[in-house]
Amino acid sequence: MEQNKQNVGFYGGTLGPWLPMLAMITLMIISTATHTGGLNRVVLIAFACLALGFFLCKDKKHYGGITLKGLTNPMLGTILMAYILAGVLAQLMRQSGIISALIWAVTKAGLNTGFLPLIAFVVCMLISTSCGTSTGSVAAVAPVLVPLAASLNVDVGLMCGAIISGAIFGDNLAPISDTTISSALTQEAELGDVVRTRFPYAALSAVVSAGLFVWFGMKMSTGAAGALNLDGSTAKSLVLLVLPVLMVIMMRKGWDLIATLITCDVLGIVLNLVLGCIPLSKMLDGKGPVVAGMSGMMILVLYVLLLFQMLEILNASGAFENLNAGLLNMCKTPRSGELVCFLAASLGSFATGGSGIAILFFGSVVRSITKTFGIDRCRGANILDGVACGTTGLMPYGNPMLVSLGVVMALEKADPNFSFMNVIPYTFHCWGLLIIFLLSILTGIGRRYEEKKPVA
């Protein structure tokens, strides 16, 4: 079976298997630029590109079986359930009246709304560093702060960018993050050394990002929270803020994301009923938080199902292996070797849909390059992880972006044309990681070499 998987042929030579994915990204950008974006259009694009793969595949008779293998990826079930359960949590929070309560609290505190993006960034930094998960951090914070931003006339794209940036910070730096662990293991480096040497890059990007969030926050918000006239009748719903806190604690204690979300959803239902925020009749209604939360994520679920089938095209055709071999042939000097590591991490993330798989898949390539030129193994781990995480935060089909878009589309007055293009310009920390590591590679700043052990 493995041999058949590797021998699936596509018209177009080595570029053939990549054409559906490249076409999807191109069409998504065009759709957004022409104001015909949104998740509904993205699903149509994904379907069209999956069909393109069918016409490019030489073995059309078995194309369905080939692509359906992508749905056996163990990550898929976790991702889909996380979206659905996060959708329920978002609706439980929204329908409880917590947004009005938060606006009331902001009004009473006299807080300038321009600081909300910075607050979102810092909160997500703390959560993701504590839990080591970007998706979980976005799922915990976005359902609360995105609707709040929309209600206070803070740019929603800016708020999503702040949330994603904070989530990527911890995913890249936290010692318990899967990407941190994977990058250290694949590069044969000590985890403590990796975190220690990685911190200056992450900290520099975070400081610059924080300044940008303050500047853009002040520029793109009215700062008029104090002018709102609310009576605080929904203040009791502020008790539900215990849910994102509980998420952080549970994930920090080692609970997986699905178990954590189920627990928080159930507790959210109980709290809403006990506090009287949502009556039982509405809770059981078709427009209630449970049904609305699940159904609101269905477009996202459909897109991910199509996406994983498209990713399987790259696996079945051997496109990943060909890319691996091609990258190795490009290395001539330490600088070019590190540039190839940069390229492998970024292309790998785009091709696999996330940083975790890319690091595991291309880790051996990066380690082979760093060994060849005697580059410090921590240096390889930091380039691999920093670039992969930064790229994932920018990807239109990356988990952090998709969760954020799902929350935005669930807003009461959501802009049907809102898309990833409204968010990408403001994911400052993601851009920062990519720029800082690229400059480090080009200038040689931070490049260290392995100490040669004396011959006995």
Which residues make up each language-model segment?
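Juxtamembrane helix-boundary/capping and inter-helix hinge elements in multi-pass membrane proteins
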Residues: K58-K61, T72-L76, N153-G157, S182-V195, ...
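Juxtamembrane and boundary regions of transmembrane helices in multi-pass small-molecule transporters
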Residues: T34, S165-A167, N172-G232, V239, ...
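Hydrophobic transmembrane alpha-helices of multi-pass small-molecule transporters
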Residues: M1-L80, R198-Y303, L442, G446-A456
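Hydrophobic alpha-helical transmembrane segments of multi-pass integral membrane proteins
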Residues: L80-V88, L111-V144, L328-S368, T372-F373, ...
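Short helix-coil transition sites and intra-membrane helix breaks within transmembrane domains
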Residues: G38, T78, A90-S100, F115, ...
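Alpha-helical transmembrane segments of multi-pass membrane proteins
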Residues: G114-I127, N153-F169, S336-S349, F373-L394, ...
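Core transmembrane alpha-helical segments of multi-pass membrane transporters/permeases
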Residues: N40-L44, G64-S100, G114-P117, D285-E321, ...
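Membrane-interfacial loop-to-helix junctions in multi-pass transporters
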Residues: N73-I79, W104-V122, A149-M159, S233-V239, ...
